[in-house]
Structure formats: structure tokens, C-alpha cells
Amino acid sequence: MSDEMICLEEEANVAVKHVFRAELLNAIAKNDKGAFKKCVEQIGKDWHVSRTVETKDKYKFREDLWESRNAILAHEYTWNTYNDKKHYKAYSYRSKICFLLNPVYYKLIYDGLNKKALTEFYKSINDTRKVDKETWQETVEHYYSKLPFSPKDETDIDRIFREDFKLWAKDTVKTWIVKENGHIMYKRGLTPESAQELSV
């Protein structure tokens, strides 16, 4: 009988979110604009959204996020609007920074994977709502109302990070570390129930 099953990809994903969040918040606490912008740059590279901001606009983009840090923390920043004067959209990139800084409010990252997963979720319950960036926050709030979990404060952040992973990764084959009778095994599958032991 299995004592414990851990999803390797989930733990890695959640850990990275915690690390990035800590780096952003530490930079804000120290009023270190350079460290903040460096972290934003690294997030863009690691999460493959750097390309959504043209090279000539990257400095301005990171500067804008730094100037918007308090608005993001106070959930007064809207990432899904386009300002002609700033010449960039980068909706998913901005959503990721908002989510990391203020997960209790923003709750889910806006990107293609989560959009697809939410669209499929609403189809499965015969809800015809349109899932798009304009209605994203409203849709996310409604989605969370269907979960047996309602984030209230910072003690819920780890769970929020996990919910984000579980949504976009639900159709992804994962690696499971299984501790069984004092031994460790590795399995692959969509879920713990369907996972099969790796064979050499």
C-alpha cells in the first residue's frame, strides 16, 4: 500500500513560484529596483514570455512593472489593458508578475494553457461563458467559487500555486515519486491512480 505519492513536476513548479515571489518581494522591501527588474527579466526567460515584449521596449516594460508594484500589491493594477503610449501588450507576462506578487487576489495566471483548461472546464458544466483576457478576473473568481477552496490570506498561497499548476497540467503526463513500504519508486501518468511504474 502506498504511503505517499508526490508529483515531481508540481513540486518543482510550486517551488519556482515561491522563489520568484520571494525575490520580487525582497527587492520591493529593500527598494532595490535593479534586483526587481532582474527577477522580472528572469521570469520572462524561464516562463517563455520575454518574446512578448520587443527588445526596444524591455527596459520600459520592466520600469513600468516596478512603478506599478504597489498597485499590484493593492490589486489595483489591470494587466489586461493596452496603453498605446507604452507600445506593449505582454498580457501573459504582466499576469505572471501580478500572480506572483499578489496570488490571493489574482489567483490564476493568464496564458494559453490556463485559458484552454478553463474553457474546457466551462464546457464540461455546460456554461457558455467566454473565457478571454477581458473577463479573466471575473472568470477566475467564478471558477474558484466552484472549488472547495477559497483563498483568504497569505497562508493560502501554496495552495493557490498548486491550483494553478493542477489546472494547466491536468492533461499532462507527470512523474510521481511513490514511497511504498519504505521503498521509493517512480511512476508516470496523468494521475496517481493511472500512473504506471517506470520499467527499464
Named regions from a protein language model:
Residues 93-99:
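Short hydrophobic alpha-helical segments that form membrane-spanning helices or hydrophobic packing faces
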